[in-house]
From Swiss-Prot:
Broad class of where this protein is predominantly found: membrane
One Gene Ontology cellular component: plasma membrane
Membrane-related topology note: Peripheral membrane protein
4Fe-4S among keywords: no
HAMAP family the record matches: DabA
Localization per Swiss-Prot or TrEMBL: Cell membrane
Cofactor entry: Zn(2+)
Function statement: Part of an energy-coupled inorganic carbon pump.
Family stated for the protein in its record: Belongs to the inorganic carbon transporter (TC 9.A.2) DabA family.
Keywords from the UniProt entry: Cell membrane, Membrane, Metal-binding, Transport, Zinc
Protein's organism: Bacillus cytotoxicus (strain DSM 22905 / CIP 110041 / 391-98 / NVH 391-98)
Matches recorded under Pfam families: DabA
Full protein name: Probable inorganic carbon transporter subunit DabA
Length: 874
């Protein structure tokens, strides 16, 4: 229940205010309040974002109720989504009615259960109450006659921002005006070199820069500017002063700050992320709240005497009565003849069995149906076969759901074994491309890099390459500067019009050819030299982390990753380490289609480093001493899986043995067929696409190069499960590109350490991806990022709708919906399936408190495939 926007004249009582707040305490309040938002990475390094990561100590149901209460955000699937899933046959209604019976068993009532059950079953149809019934004079008269039924009133337990309770004389909520101002200042401060003029005094901090400029802001009234001019110069003091002026009691400060953070969770999220990146900005979130709440005081100050913070909201009787008449077959006359006690009980049942609970029961049945069908698919394909198959090549892919169809097609095409592992390949590294001083943390975002790896070339080749790259960069930079300059922007259309006009025509009508031409032209011009890596340990004066690895670290990382892959024996002549990347044009969300395990970057860099390490004689000697013997004729190579076009690009091929060369030739021979089949399967799932494609590969390339294409691929939509086990468990299953697949052999993991590492790393990445897609589907207006066609890239950080919206944090509408009315992504919580004996799962849950909390509180689902008892839900 959201707070009413009606303002009463009852002032907040003075005795409720206890502003004995020390400035040093305010940071503790801010830190505690930050649990309600999640860090938001810049869109150029888009990383999956679990919106409720700080709330996992509460159950999913509690968080759903809380969000509905304080923000009116519903995070259960809508009735239309449930109806669509039912039409598609994705919900077994036996699970629905089993859930209903469990709910009825948990309730206590004094009327016949059969009567309640009939009502509930009818209400589960999720049809709307007829409007003529809700508006009927007889029903409203009956509601007025029922006395003392709705005796319970609900006091709002969280302090809403005062600005959200007030409207100005133009009937505009003051919260909207406040948001407009805060967005403006956030864009100015956080701008990542997109604008030509930087915010003055930005280097001194957000609050200081704002305080310096606010007295000149023409969007504020003269009185507001004067009041803020005399405001404290320190952010902590300003925040304490604002809370005191607004008369927020100390016991409500945290919830009041939470309300403000949830008002613009995108901007607050990227500020939270920035605060964790450097010591200099560690208090940035406090500064943000100081700016926001100081401005709130200035805007609402004339209205403060009118605000009532303790609003109560009564439950409306009319829809409860209507529900029993519509679904319970009770007439108004029968209602009139009931005793007050019976009326109260029926209304209480209707109140508790509300639409949110009904949709929750359907949603849980949807999840149970998915789990049941997945278990049937897996168990029905199991057979005992101890015969070792001949394997010509082993190919390790990222666990990404887009790898599953490609791996399936590869295995059908030849004697190949595919392996699933997180696409950073166990290397906790930050990577620096050739000639770049910038490094990118190429590992899951919840981890920190321990080593920096630089791409190297000879001095002469590097110098020549950097010169060509500088020319390439200068052209685009000059164009940008001319476009933003007051004078040259007038001349630019005349100079560039003919060229840009031709480019527009070519981009629109022959996108594949033009894209290929531009890419080849740039590649020819840059002529990137052959490179190597700084793999050997060296102290880095530019960074806190060292360059390269020691000999022991090289051996340890390779050993750990090979064990995670379950690849410690029976090596094929060729082992291919496959990272993955995407390809799209005019797409701000390009990084969202890259490797999540590599922090939103392509995985080829990590793949090449790992393959190189595996080929080093010193590493092989170290592995051999620990019992992992790699044959001399086994060679590790690296490739990159292009998910948008389902092709494999070789990025590292060392000198090959004869058997490895044979394997490579075989892979290259079957790759066109594999790509054709994988593209055909994937493209058929795109909306409004022809069912018969003459050339799927050509169509896939057109999607990748077309600058008007809002959906070059589905990304990780429809992800629903994370399966940890041997490939034989799922090899004969068509998992429809919905499963993250990670290899695991419990027989080689007596201690359980490997399983714990998989859950803590890749398992967490998969959960974050799953919940980001979930949130963007069920609450796109709050957790999604809107329509790609109307987005505005702002401040070099992310996207907005228009020029004054929240910084949008989720995936776009086109990534989860196949039409305006039909969702493509199924909003189901991630089902983690572990192939291991039950005692392994019990040990994992006992040792890993965080994971146990996720399972117990309903943030993930858990099942296991026990070699003795089969499938088991936990």
């Amino acid at each position: 229940m959201s707070v009413s926007s009606v303002v009463t004249k009852e002032s907040f009582k003075k005795k409720d205010v206890n502003m004995n707040i020390q400035e040093k305490d305010i940071n503790d309040f801010v830190q505690s309040a930050s649990r309600v938002i999640a860090p938001l990475w810049p869109i150029s390094t888009f990383a999956a974002r679990h919106p409720w990561v700080g709330l996992e100590k509460q159950s999913f149901e509690q968080v759903a109720d809380w969000l509905k209460e304080i923000r009116d955000v519903d995070i259960y699937p809508s009735a239309s989504m449930i109806h669509s899933a039912k039409r598609r046959g994705e919900i077994d209604e036996s699970f629905l009615y089993a859930g209903l019976h469990r709910w009825l068993d948990s309730q206590s009532f004094h009327i016949p259960r059969e009567k309640v059950e009939r009502y509930c079953q009818a209400a589960l149809k999720l049809d709307k109450l007829p409007s003529h019934l809700l508006l009927s004079k007889e029903l409203n008269t009956l509601a007025a006659e029922i006395n003392n039924v709705n005796t319970e009133s609900t006091e709002d337990f969280s302090m809403q921002p005062i600005s959200s309770l007030i409207e100005n004389q133009d009937s505009e909520r003051l919260a909207n005006i406040l948001d407009y101002h805060v967005i403006k200042w956030c864009k100015l401060y956080l701008d990542n070199f997109q604008s030509s003029w930087a915010m003055p005094n930005r280097e001194k901090g957000f609050y200081h820069a704002w305080h310096h400029l606010i007295k000149y802001d023409p969007a504020l009234s003269k009185q507001q500017r004067k009041a803020l001019k005399d405001w404290p110069q320190d952010a902590n003091a300003a925040l304490v002063r604002a809370l005191s002026e607004l008369k927020i009691p100390k016991s409500k400060i945290q919830t009041y700050l939470e309300g403000h953070l949830l008002s613009l969770p995108g901007w607050a999220g990227i500020i939270l992320w920035r605060s964790k990146q450097s010591i200099r900005e560690h208090a940035l979130l406090t500064e943000y709240l100081a700016v926001r709440i100081s401005m709130e005081w200035a805007i609402v100050n004339p209205y403060l005497s009118l605000v009532n913070h303790r609003l109560k909201k009564k439950v409306s009787i009319v829809p409860l009565l209507a529900s029993w008449i519509h679904w319970g077959d009770l007439s108004i006359e029968e209602w009139s003849q009931m005793s007050a006690t019976e009326q109260n009980e029926l209304l209480s049942i209707a109140h508790h069995f509300d639409e949110k609970l009904r949709r929750k029961l359907w949603w849980e049945a949807w999840e149970q149906t998915h789990a049941e069908r997945l278990s049937q698919e897996i168990l029905s394909k199991q057979c005992v076969n101890n015969k070792k198959k001949f394997v010509l090549a082993q190919m390790a892919f990222c666990i990404d759901v887009r790898s599953e169809p490609f791996r399936r097609q590869l295995e059908k095409a030849g004697p190949f074994e595919t392996i699933g592992i997180a696409g950073f390949f166990g290397l906790p590294i930050a990577t620096s491309e050739l000639g770049s001083h910038h490094s990118h943390p190429s590992l899951p975002v919840m981890q920190k890099p321990k080593h920096r790896i630089k791409e190297l070339a000879s001095e002469d080749e590097l110098k020549s390459y950097q010169q060509r790259k500088k020319v390439d960069h200068s052209l685009s930079y000059t164009f940008k500067m001319m476009k933003q300059n007051v004078l040259t922007s007038l001349l630019l259309p005349e100079l560039s019009g003919p060229f840009l006009g031709l480019q527009m025509i070519a981009r629109s009508f022959v996108p594949r050819r033009l894209g290929s031409f531009i890419r080849n032209l740039r590649k020819t011009w840059l002529r990137k030299p052959d490179t190597r890596f700084s793999l050997d340990y060296a102290h880095d004066t530019e960074s806190e982390i060292p360059i390269g690895f020691s000999k022991e670290e090289k051996v340890n990382y390779v050993r750990q990753t090979l064990k995670m892959m379950g690849l410690t024996e029976n090596f094929a002549p060729l082992v291919v380490i496959c990272g993955h990347s995407s390809q799209s044009t005019n797409n701000p969300y390009a990084a969202a289609l890259e490797c999540g395990a590599c922090g939103g970057a392509a995985g080829g860099f990590n793949a090449r480093i790992f393959a190189t390490l595996c080929n080093l004689p010193e590493v092989r000697e170290g592995l051999s001493a620990e019992g992992i013997k790699i044959p001399e004729d086994t060679v590790f190579a690296a490739a990159e899986h292009k998910t948008t076009v389902d092709e494999l690009e070789w990025i590292y091929i060392p000198e090959l043995s004869e058997s490895a060369r044979e394997a490579l030739n075989h892979i290259e021979a079957i790759m066109p067929k594999v790509s054709h089949n994988a593209n055909r399967e994937r493209l058929a799932q795109l909306p409004n696409f022809k069912t018969k494609m003459k050339n799927p590969r050509a169509e896939a390339h057109r999607f990748a190069e077309d600058w008007s294409e809002i959906r070059p691929e589905w990304g990780l939509a429809r992800n629903a499960s994370f399966i940890i086990g041997q490939r034989e468990l799922t090899q004969d299953c068509d998992l429809e590109g919905r499963a993250f697949l990670h290899n695991y052999d419990w027989k080689q993991d007596e201690s359980g350490d490997i399983l714990a590492s998989i859950i803590a790393g890749p398992g967490t990445v998969a959960q974050w991806i799953n919940l980001q897609y979930y949130a963007s589907t069920v609450a796109p207006h709050y957790y999604g990022s809107g329509n790609k066609a109307t987005q505005t890239v702002t401040a070099g950080l992310g996207v907005m709708q228009g020029n004054a919206s929240d910084l949008l944090s989720g995936v776009p509408w086109q990534s989860v919906m196949q039409s305006d009315d039909e969702a493509y992504h199924s909003p189901l919580r991630l089902l983690i399936v572990i192939q291991a004996p039950s005692q392994y799962i019990e040990r994992l849950l006992n040792n890993d408190f965080i994971f146990r909390e996720k399972v117990q509180n309903g943030w993930v689902r858990l099942a296991s495939v026990d070699p003795e008892v089969g499938w088991k839900n936990w």
